[in-house]
Curated annotation (Swiss-Prot):
Native source species: Arabidopsis thaliana (Mouse-ear cress)
Effect of residue 204 to A: Loss of interaction with LHCP
Coiled coil: 57-79
GO cellular component: chloroplast; chloroplast envelope; chloroplast stroma; chloroplast thylakoid membrane; cytosol; protein-containing complex; signal recognition particle, endoplasmic reticulum targeting
Principal place of residence: plastid
ANK repeat start-end pairs: 136-158, 159-188, 193-222, 242-269
Annotated transmembrane regions: none
GO biological process: protein heterotrimerization; protein import into chloroplast thylakoid membrane; response to high light intensity
Function summary: Component of the chloroplast signal recognition particle pathway. Required for post-translational targeting of proteins into the thylakoid membrane but seems to be dispensable for co-translational targeting with a translating ribosome present. May be able to function independently of cpFTSY and FFC/cpSRP54 in targeting LHCPs to the thylakoids. Acts as a highly specific chaperone for LHCPs, preventing aggregation and being able to dissolve aggregates.
Name the UniProt record assigns to this protein: Signal recognition particle 43 kDa protein, chloroplastic
Chain positions covered by the region annotation Disordered: 65-85
Note in the entry: Unlike eukaryotic or prokaryotic signal recognition particle (SRP), the chloroplast SRP from higher plants lacks an SRP-RNA component. It targets both chloroplast-encoded and nucleus-encoded substrates to the thylakoid membrane, post-translationally for the nucleus-encoded proteins and co-translationally for the chloroplast-encoded proteins.
Oligomer and partners: Homodimer. Component of the cpSRP complex, composed of a FFC/cpSRP54 monomer and a CAO/cpSRP43 dimer. Interacts (via chromo domains 2 and 3) with ALB3 (via C-terminus), but not with ALB3L1/ALB4. Can interact simultaneously with ALB3 and FFC/cpSRP54. Interacts with LHCP and LTD.
Length: 373
């Protein structure tokens, strides 16, 4: 298989049980910091932290001069690197540019507050995040369900991927639905290619997940960094998947299912102007169609073309634009109503069966006739 996606990182985060606090380094010099919120700029003995939203406030206590004794100097050196004690993380949310913030429960009883991840010891973040990402990378529906409370379902890893992208790539439509119901962004793009959950499901050949995402409202027109939609990506992979290799047969079948689901969504709301050409037979028949919105002609599988349009093409009927109805009569069979139609692209008017004439034009014609007709 040609690698279109980057392999998902399944490495768990390491927890250092010896660390459980936010560390503030002592100042390296007496010069003022360029940031008013930089803890490194504060000559502290003990700091009480209180982050509220994006605001970091620090209360400084007076710094006492050390004595000449070695014991007191060591004590001051130790206290100059004090900590704001963390009890645990109780919530998370995404910040700008893929950064994370965590709701901290403090050991000193201070009100919980939001703190940027960069200010929190790695072991504290790891203890909170590891179960979540382990569950996501295993598509563990039960574990994800238990961990959802007070957590941002759109939390991102180092590659900007959410849990939804992982479970989509792993093929768990149950996990996809669980996360979607929890409010997951169905169209989130990662930072390693601009891939969405739909791209992941298409690229890893998960037709059931593709169908679920489409049903849930995922935008099939979202493009990755190469400008490819999930449908275009699936087509690209199918082209590079060997036809004669028995080992790839199942993969090709899966890709065709993915493409069929996505094509069905693309053409569901597209209106065909006319069929230009036909190729293939039976279930493999395709039509080259011209769209009413003026888009380029495209080859479309027969199942996605309205039956009446396909039948008209097969019967040799052509489409033209009617300008108005200028006459009415009963057909040769004595029953069928026919209308004399004036065309925009033809000089001669023609008699057409009622079924072939726009009902709006028929109504306008009838309104123009005397009441006794």
């Amino acid at each position: 298989m040609q690698k279109v996606f980057l392999a998902m990182d399944t490495c768990a985060l390491v927890i250092h049980q010896s660390l459980s606090r936010i560390k503030l380094s002592p100042p390296k010099s007496s010069s003022s910091s360029s940031s008013a919120f930089s803890p490194e700029s504060l000559p502290i003995r003990r700091i009480e932290l209180c982050f509220r939203g994006a605001i970091c406030a620090a209360v400084q206590r007076n710094y006492e001069e050390t004595t000449s004794s070695v014991e007191e100097a060591e004590e001051d050196d130790e206290s100059s690197s004090s900590y704001g004690e963390v009890n645990k993380i109780i919530g998370s949310r995404t910040a700008g540019e893929g950064a994370m913030e965590y709701l901290i429960e403090w050991k000193d009883g201070h009100s919980p507050s939001w703190v940027p991840s960069s200010y929190i010891a790695a072991d504290v973040v790891s203890e909170y995040e590891t179960p979540w990402w382990t569950a996501a990378r295993k598509a563990d529906e039960q574990a994800l369900s238990q961990l959802l409370e007070d957590r941002d379902v759109d939390a991102v890893d180092e590659n900007g991927r959410t849990a939804l992208l992982f479970v989509a790539g792993l093929g768990s439509d149950k996990c996809v639905r669980l996360l979607a119901e929890a409010g997951a962004d169905l169209d989130h793009r990662d930072m390693r290619g601009g891939l969405t959950a739909l791209h992941m499901a298409a690229g890893y050949v998960r037709p059931e997940v593709v169908e679920a995402l489409v049903e849930l409202g995922a935008d099939i027109e979202v493009e990755d960094e190469r400008g490819l939609t999930a449908l275009e990506l699936a087509r690209e992979i199918l082209k590079t998947t060997p036809k004669g290799n028995p080992m790839q047969f199942g993969r090709r079948i899966g890709l065709e299912k993915v493409i069929n689901v996505l094509e069905g969504q693309v053409f569901e709301y597209a209106e065909v102007d006319e069929i230009v050409e036909k190729r293939g037979k039976g279930k493999d028949v395709e039509y080259l169609v011209r769209w009413k919105d003026g888009g380029d002609c495209e080859w479309v599988k027969g199942v996605h073309v309205a039956e009446d349009v396909a039948k008209d093409y097969e019967d040799g009927l052509e489409y033209a634009v009617a300008e108005s109805v200028i006459g009415k009569r009963v057909g040769d069979d004595g029953k069928t109503i026919e209308y004399l139609v004036k065309w925009t692209d033809m000089s001669d008017a023609t008699w057409e069966p009622q079924d072939n004439v726009d009902s709006t034009l028929v109504l306008l014609y009838q309104q123009q006739q005397p009441m006794n007709e």
